[in-house]
Amino acid sequence: MWRLTRKIGTRIHISNQLSPIFNKAIGTVPVFRFYSSSPEQKYRKKLLEEAQKQGFNSIEELKNHLKETIESKKREFNKIDPLKELEDYQQKTQMENNNSKHLMTKSRSPLDPSAPKVPFKTLDSFLDVGKLKDLSKQEVEFLWRARWAQKDNTLCAVIPVSVYDKMMANARNNPIFVLPLPRQVQSEDAKPNEEQGMELHYIQWQFVGPQTTHCMMTSLAEYKLHQEFARPHTTLQFHSDLVKDKGIVFMNGHVEPDTNVNVQDAQLLLLNVQRFYGAMGEETPVAKQRVQLLRDFSKASPGFTVEKLISLSQSMEN
């Protein structure tokens, strides 16, 4: 962690054709004779012709090929829809807390698709990179933190390149994820802060430039409502311009003021971004489980569940 200064079985009717042959004779016990021949034995010549037609030298090669195809289909059928899983969870939570009031993230109007695109900001937009190269690592870090110290609704960090590389390797392979954020639940019978609910947030990475990467956070409810035009409540920018010279990466983030996501909420989401994307390593059992859950989500594997996501996000173990 760096220090902050703000996605069936076929019923196989096996009829072994074990139709017993009754040789009935007066005064004798029926003898059951079972006849069973596998398709391969019965149609070996046809199977061999089919195998050769498909470019295989033997029936065994054909069987191995079909086995791989069948296993691939089974994996496809077993895939889950992660967003459907999340939707089911939200509906379940809503029903359980039907009489409760959640302090959920406010939904906003979608982005205007016709609006001109604003060029993304690079490190040079904030500091003169040319001049930074002549300064020591400590001086550069001080300048970066000072640049954001007096600004509201901001986050900033200086990240060791080794930590950044671990996180980016997972981000490039898994650019989309979801993370839970604890939310206060206030019911008619419960005092404020007595109960907690969970609100899910959509995490998306964008590699906008050779040395600039964005991580955007949007409530899942808003993403489902507006899709690609949903407004992120928090945007993190990573600048890797000084990796070779100083061995560090700068991060700055902005939390939109017109939502009820505050800087502390964004910090908690950022902490779990680091943990699930492997920034803290994958040495411990819990750390391995987090990164594996991220990969399960990307692969739409049944291994991903919202319950496991919440449990691992709340665990104090790293």
Swiss-Prot record:
GO terms for biological process: mitochondrial proton-transporting ATP synthase complex assembly; mitochondrion organization. One of its GO terms (molecular function) is unfolded protein binding. Coiled coil: none annotated. Residues 1-40 form a transit peptide. One of its GO terms (cellular component) is mitochondrial matrix. It comes from the Eukaryota. The modification Phosphoserine is found at S109. Keywords: Mitochondrion, Phosphoprotein, Transit peptide. Belongs to the ATP11 family. It comes from Saccharomyces cerevisiae (strain ATCC 204508 / S288c). It holds the Pfam family ATP11. This is Protein ATP11, mitochondrial. Disulfide bonds: none annotated. Transmembrane segments: none annotated. Essential for the assembly of the mitochondrial F1-F0 complex. May interact with the alpha and/or beta subunits of F1-ATPase. It is found in: Mitochondrion. Present with 2840 molecules/cell in log phase SD medium.
